[in-house]
Amino acid sequence: SNYCNSNCIYCQAQSNQLNSCKMMTKEIAKKSVDFALHSPQKELNFEFQGGEPLSNFEIIKYIVEYTNSVNKEKTIQYSLVSNLSLLTDEMIEFFKKYNVSISTSLDGHELLHNYNRPLSNYPNTYKLLGKTIAKLKENNIPYGAIQTTIKKSLKYPQEIINEYREKGLNNIFIRPLTPLGYALDK
């Protein structure tokens, strides 16, 4: 899906409203899986991203279940890159069952994260992310995070490190700002 419910200040894709978005269909998903399974690679990683991939969770389920039903010889890993704002208990159970690893974004302390990553329908994305990370921990689902650096972030290096430690993250993947879309002036 290219739909996203977030309005990140540095979005390179720029947020799409639901009425202008495109969702992957089962037909395209099946063709994509079949194509990947015919590759010479012995190991594959299917990564779900977007937009916000959880907005099309039914297709994620379809891809994983279809792949597992037809795959006979490849090692398949699944991963998800998401803001996690749409995460439900049903999704957690599914990701746990199929060993889906998860990556999200954590840009720093509460004020910095909320400044960078506002949701269109939720005032405090930092607190919401903290709740979803706690659920992932409770369910032993592997997760990681990416920190997108903007000029404002440079004032808070220790605070960013502290946030990652407090959230149980042992590594910080720092992504510099790419000057595309809304990110041009950040």
Model-derived regions: residue spans:
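A C-terminal junction/extension of Radical SAM enzymes
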Residues: 183-186
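Radical SAM/AdoMet-radical enzyme domain recognition
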Residues: 21, 29-49, 56-179
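Canonical Radical SAM [4Fe-4S] cluster-binding loop centered on the CxxxCxxC motif
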Residues: 1-26
